[in-house]
Structures are given as C-alpha cells and as structure tokens.
Amino acid sequence: MTQDPRFPNLFILNHPLIQHKLTHMRDKDTSTRTFRELLREITLLMGYEITRNLPLTTRHIETPMGPMDAPVIAGRKLAVVPVLRAGVGMSDGLLELIPSARVGHIGVYRDEQHRPVEYLVRLPDLEERTFILCDPMVATGHSAVHAVDVMKQRGVPDEHILFLALVAAPEGVEVFQQAHPGVKLYVASLDSHLNEHAYIIPGLGDAGDRLFGTKN
C-alpha cells in the first residue's frame, strides 16, 4: 500500500495481483464476462487489504483441545454499499470475503454537466456500523462525494466510512478530499488526468457499460 503526498487520505493498493488483474481490466479487448470476473476478483483482494485494521475483540470458545479466548471482529457487522450501477459489480467480491455483511445501495448518475443526480437510497441500520462504499471510478469525484454525503447526513461518522474504487483521477481525488478530508479513499490506481469528456486517462473506459455489456 502506497500514498501520494498530495492526498493524505488516499491509499493506493499496489499488491502485484491487484495490479495484474487491473491491467487485464483496462485492455479494450477484454470480454464482458472476463471483465465481470476480474472485477469480482480484484475487489476481493482489495477488500482484504482495506479490512486489515478492523478492531478485534475476543470471544470464549471451545476447541477440540480445550477452551480459549479467540480473536473476532469487534462491533456490529460491516455493511457494503455499492454506488449504482457499476458499484454492484464490486459487491460480489466484498460479500465473498465478508459473507455476513449487510448490503445497502445508493443510486447516483451523472447529468450532462457531470453533476450527481440521486435516484435511490436503501441502507441497513446505521448505528455503530462500518460502511464500505464502492464504485469502480472516481473521475470528477462528485458522485463519490455525494455518496459520502448521504451517509454523513444520516449520522455516520468519517471513521466508519471507507470508500473503495479501482481507478481515480487526481482531479476527482482533490474534490473528494476537500469535501471529506476525514474519509479514507482506497484505489488500485491513481491515473493521469481527466479528458475533456471527464473520462479518466488512461482509465478503463465506462465501467458500467463494460460490466453489463451496454452501450453509452
């Protein structure tokens, strides 16, 4: 895991398997089926990385050889909240890693001016729960900011929110960290820049279209 000195709460997950799979996802010749499988696999690996500092407590159990106080994750069950629609493709990998997690959804799309438009919010009980928000791309950053706004407006503190993305542009990370400096953002890659159409360069194209086999 590395950091960029410009962005104190951005964490780049540079594990070799993550980077290898991301390269195949970027390839324009990768099929929809393979893209979908890779997204699940890479999200599982990223989920392993971002949960390494979850707090632990102990629970008394009996092993076949006798009693012990064994480590378990402290607090209430985690929640996975994909940002629709492309974030749905990331939830499978996280739920494979954390099958007991609760699931919410935040529906946001970008209008012609690249502003976020909310159309759905469905969340589990919020109290004392850690939330992993996921969206493959942080381009302009506005959708990510809006998704975190949704959580914080409902009383979820910064330290209980983790935002997970595959690829981000510096412009979007700047917007995100100005809006939510206390929320940690985890990505597989910090790419070069946004083009005139607000697409990440080099990026991987439209993640939703590639995931679902649709045309923009």
From Swiss-Prot:
GO terms for biological process: UMP salvage; uracil salvage. Pathway: Pyrimidine metabolism; UMP biosynthesis via salvage pathway; UMP from uracil: step 1/1. Signal peptide: none annotated. It is an enzyme of class 2 (transferase). Its cofactor is Mg(2+). Its EC number is 2.4.2.9. Pfam families: UPRTase. Keywords: Allosteric enzyme, Glycosyltransferase, GTP-binding, Magnesium, Nucleotide-binding, Transferase. Catalyzes the conversion of uracil and 5-phospho-alpha-D-ribose 1-diphosphate (PRPP) to UMP and diphosphate. PANTHER family: ADENINE PHOSPHORIBOSYLTRANSFERASE, URACIL PHOSPHORIBOSYLTRANSFERASE, CHLOROPLASTIC. This is Uracil phosphoribosyltransferase. It comes from Ralstonia nicotianae (strain ATCC BAA-1114 / GMI1000).
